[in-house]
Amino acid sequence: MLGPIGHLAALAAYGFRRGAQVRHDLDAHRELAWAQAGVAELPRGLEIQWLGTAGFRLSYQGQHLLIDPYLTRLPLGDLLRRRVVRADAARLAALPDPIAILVGHTHFDHALDVPALAARAGCPVYGSRSLAHLMALHDHAERAVVVEPHHPYELGPFTVTFIPSKHAKLAGGLWVPYGGELTCEHVDALTPQAYKCGQVWGLHIAVAGVTIYHQGSCDLIEDALVHRGVDVLLCGISGRRFTARYVNRLLRALAPKLVVPHHFDDFFRPLDAPLTMNLNVNLAGFVDEVGAVSREFAVRTLGLGEAVGGPP
């Protein structure tokens, strides 16, 4: 794995080839489109929707589960100016009321919209102590469930287990930006930088006879991954270059039948803007990395806001 200087050099090289790389990634995204695969990989009645970034909606039997929903998508300028950003209720209106919301960690691109969604739906949210603190800031402390590792939570038709995980060290491979616990003392101080990472969780979900694993950040604790042979791996890929052998280790631990990459989009652009790629995410390269582990792993992509389901 590269050191800090190597990462800086790689970023500089990306700057020169960015246009070509983005086009290559968009081509790969189109070629791997799940809707064009012609294979019904989900059971009847189960639907998966990508909400952009690491966000997903899972629906079964008329009940909905949200994972890391982030539709507000603040502009980059708001991050740089450290502006307090509120959840965009108009954008959140596109989502159905969930029975629960699951949060893998509390960076803004995973947690900013959660209090507003939970308040609207009157549903519980499951995650870390940092998430509970965030909910308390919004006067919804009673809706927060601080989870226990490896404990199965029965949420309607879904059985959810939280798996201890780690966040990629995006700062040149040295540290996690905005790491530590979320300790902000007032909602008026909730700048993007105030959304500290908190405890990181992977999510194992069983529903309709299939298993789904959501990996929201590009690092892992291999000894914690006890669910081998999952049906669908929702695999975050942004920042994986900062974690040694991330793809290899994750795939060998989980042995998924299907891999669905996410967290490769530029999440500073609104959801209704054309898809473009996050900084140096290299989606096409990810496909090669999966193939290097085994050609038996199928890779499928979803478009922003796209939903796929089992046979009618």
Predicted regions: what they are:
Residues A94-P96, L117-A121, V226-G229, L250-A255:
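Short, conserved loop/helix-junction motifs that constitute active-site signature segments
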Residues P124, A136-P152, N248, R252, ...:
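Binuclear metal-ion centers of metallo-dependent hydrolases, dominated by the metallo-beta-lactamase
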Residues D188-A253:
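Active-site-proximal loop/helix segments of hydrolase catalytic cores
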